[in-house]
């Protein structure tokens, strides 16, 4: 009876969820009911509650469907561990059906519910409880919303599970995921990359023996998504690469240089969220040890005595190196005692045997010294010997006391190899060379060389920025020049219109007899050229005076015309332009009559007839 009443109450509350006015009240009551369920009671309240929740179908309103899935998360959090294990298969089946819902908020609620249930479920095992049903949905669904939802649910379940079975994740799921995200038929690539990141974060690579080729394929797969047009795929790939650098940092030395170059070219993403993840991922990859850092600790001084059997090298001044790991390949060269650099170093070692123990390896070689040696290398000349090397080292000690000993080792050994090659056909022997009073090992991955490469890259970027600024300045100058040209053209046209109006005023005044031919040249501006006036301004082309004046001014330049116009307008003195038509003569009996549709035209005077003839 109690169970029946409980189902009725829940049905009423679910109905109220569909109404916007009663949604808040019904949601609060359902959450309270879910928290008060006792799973140990024999009344079956938990089973009836879950059955009512799962009975909601697509015919209900989206708010009802969404809150019913939310109630599953509330149940998993409020109930003891493994309380929902008997209903887990039914719950996941219903959730996978909800993943096809076009409403993205419902899919997000499904992901949150799966995460909550996974965190509170330890039995049955993760593989059979979550990974198998969700992975089957991910690999078999053809609808994009279902693919996205299944991938995100699987990733949330892996992240939240207390024991996600990382060995099986790496052996079974990860290879299939790599093939899936590379398939063109799979639309939810960003969600698939999220699952790969979750598998890496759960220890899927460390829990099984992954070959170098398999790791390289995974890194290449993730790098390919950094150039994707989908910003979500770029963000997911950056997160996965960051987790990979955190979990498998000791196995990524051979990929570090290549990956960091790609990261540098992609870190300025246009999406802020992607930029933030990129920066975090780059910091994680910078912590990955280089190939040179995988070398074991140096040998003792006693073990290196055999390398100096001739007695010319002081004891305690040699830094040897043991063989590297299988992935590290170091080529060591030494400078024979006959070379100029070795002779200078031997003399300095004999002179400064006391200071030898106090001076650190950092002071022996610094960035200016490396720069000078690189210049000698580029010039094709051998490295100078004698006292200048000692002065260089002393100056470098004062300026750069913070240079690391590892970078000094690498740079000196590399430059020693160059010097030995320049001094003749000297065969490489052993594993050391002498510079100053230190015997150093060669390291091809020199930090100083990397610094020089970074400086060269920065210089190239600055040159590109300078070129872009120069192009912008050229564009601005062209724009300003075209604007000035347009203003000059407009000014010329306006000036031509003014001249045309003055010419018309002059013709009307002459035709009306208000000015004589002699005085008109002092009161009106003359037209410099016929190109300023369209043909519609000329009513008669047989005017002798106009034709003669047009031919007179056609060959004059603009400057002469402006001087002449200003002289005619102002009569040689400051004042306004006088329009002859504006003068009113009281003795003039000119009558101009307008004829409009049937009105009789008055008899014009002699002056009006002359005006009509002119127009």
From Swiss-Prot:
Region entry Disordered, spans: 288-446
Gene Ontology CC entries for this record: microtubule
One GO MF term: microtubule binding
Classification lineage: Eukaryota, Viridiplantae, Streptophyta, Embryophyta, Tracheophyta
Keyword Cell membrane: no
Any Pfam family: TOR1L1_N
Sequence ranges of the HEAT repeats: 44-81, 86-123, 125-163, 168-205, 213-250
InterPro entries referenced in this protein's UniProt entry, alphabetically: ARM-like, ARM-type_fold, TORTIFOLIA1/SINE1-2
Transport listed as a keyword: no
Biased composition regions of type Basic and acidic residues, renumbered to the chain: 391-406
Biased composition (Polar residues): 318-347, 407-426
Domain of life: Eukaryota
UniProt modified residues of type Phosphoserine: 456
The name this protein goes by in its record: TORTIFOLIA1-like protein 3
Keywords, comma-separated and alphabetical: Phosphoprotein, Repeat
